[in-house]
Amino acid sequence: MAGGSEKSVFLKWSWFLEWLTPDRATLKHIEDVIFQGRSRFQEIAVVRVSGEGKVLVLDGKTQSSESDEFMYHEALVHPAMILHGSPRKVLILGGGEGATLREVLKHRSVEKAVMVDIDETVVNVAREHLREWHRGAFDDPRAEVVIDDAWNYVASKAETGFDVVIADLVDPLEAGPATRLYSEEYYRMVKDVMNPGGVFVTQAVSISHLTEYHAIIRNTVARVFKHVESYGVYVPSFDSMWGFVVASDDKDPRILGDRGFFETRLSHQLQGAELRFLDYASMLHMLNIPKMYREAIAREKRYATLDNQVFLPA
């Protein structure tokens, strides 16, 4: 689940103005407002947008769109799951729409998937209005939905022994609830609830519009895990190449670029489950970030701690 910004506005509920950066915005035509409300944590809306279908909007920021959510969620979930090879127990941090859970449960080895989201209202709205996203995943007997703060859940070690941890969190905005969830301290706590040989993956903001912030997330993860790799995919509803960071102490993510490795594991793990976006060609493309972004990522040396937090521009 990406995003979160106060600089977005519905104009007479006909047009949706969304700021991607302080100097870049998109304008989308709204056909219908399906749901609008507020939880304890954020403004929530489900709208129908021309050319995109249903769109989940939190605090004025697009989280995912019916037309292309599968691109984001398949890209977030499957590389980490394939890298591990046979994950039995998976932790999802965030992911209130249920689509991340949906993708995790496609893997034949999964015996239990725990989804932790702070906002019960978002989960309930998704259950009712975003069935195209979760497709019944909330009711799968392997799924457990926990309403809790992702920091508290991990810090308390309410459960351990996870093979894969997937962070599908809102962006680290200064006024937002997720900033500390991108810190070195948090990533170390996450590692403590993982099994040896586990794999961690996080959404890591826009590579094309917020390159330095993607690099900071990568650098922070790299202080905790031995092997770290960035990858990205252009998501039309985000108008951006969206970034991800995958990491492990034991498994080098670059092996995902090996065709035999990738296709053998994908076929074994999914056993015919439908993927609309991800195959070997797409994986190879995601790993090959354009040169100018790779160079910018390499130049950035900052990382985030609780005492030295880095916020996205509001």
Swiss-Prot record:
Its EC number is 2.5.1.16. S-methyl-5'-thioadenosine binds at Q42, D117, D149, A150, P177. Pathway: Amine and polyamine biosynthesis; spermidine biosynthesis; spermidine from putrescine: step 1/1. GO terms for cellular component: cytoplasm. GO terms for molecular function: spermidine synthase activity; thermospermine synthase activity. It catalyses: S-adenosyl 3-(methylsulfanyl)propylamine + putrescine = S-methyl-5'-thioadenosine + spermidine + H(+). The active site is at D168. GO terms for biological process: spermidine biosynthetic process. PROSITE patterns: PABS_1 (PS01330), PABS_2 (PS51006). Keywords: Cytoplasm, Polyamine biosynthesis, Spermidine biosynthesis, Transferase. CDD domains: AdoMet_MTases (cd02440). Its main location: cytoplasm. It is an enzyme of class 2 (transferase). Spermidine binds at H73, E97. The keyword Membrane does not apply. Residues 13-249 form the PABS domain. It holds the Pfam family Spermine_synt_N. It is found in: Cytoplasm. Disulfide bonds: none annotated. Homodimer or homotetramer. Belongs to the spermidine/spermine synthase family. Catalyzes the irreversible transfer of a propylamine group from the amino donor S-adenosylmethioninamine (decarboxy-AdoMet) to putrescine (1,4-diaminobutane) to yield spermidine. This is Polyamine aminopropyltransferase.
